[in-house]
């Protein structure tokens, strides 16, 4: 039987493992096909594909897009995406910028309650992921 996992996240979004670490884990578990579906992010796909090709794992390039439908948060999985598309990259940058601005506003509101969260610490914790500085880090 061919083992696969089509819904995974790397440290480029809310996963804890880099693309290489995730692929090593997949290899240890006998997974031959791995879908990289980071939240609103595609930055780890190329890195994953390059490393996976060396260890015999097929990467399905994907994404998990966040959206709202009738005031309900939904996540939409997309597979076999064009991760090199400049239009997609521009859209994802726009989404990241909106999240970061919202996070800054929340930090400012928390100061009114004497809750001071240094932005440099939040940015360090957020790392390089697509989620960027977001609610998850506050």
Language-model features: where?
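Active-site gating loops and adjacent loop-to-helix segments of metal-dependent hydrolytic enzymes
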Residues: 68-100
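An N-terminally biased module of ancient metal coordination in phosphate/nucleic-acid-related enzymes
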Residues: 1-72
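Generic hydrophobic/packing signal
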Residues: 63, 80-82, 114
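Conserved small/polar residues in nucleotide/adenosyl-binding loops
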Residues: 136-138
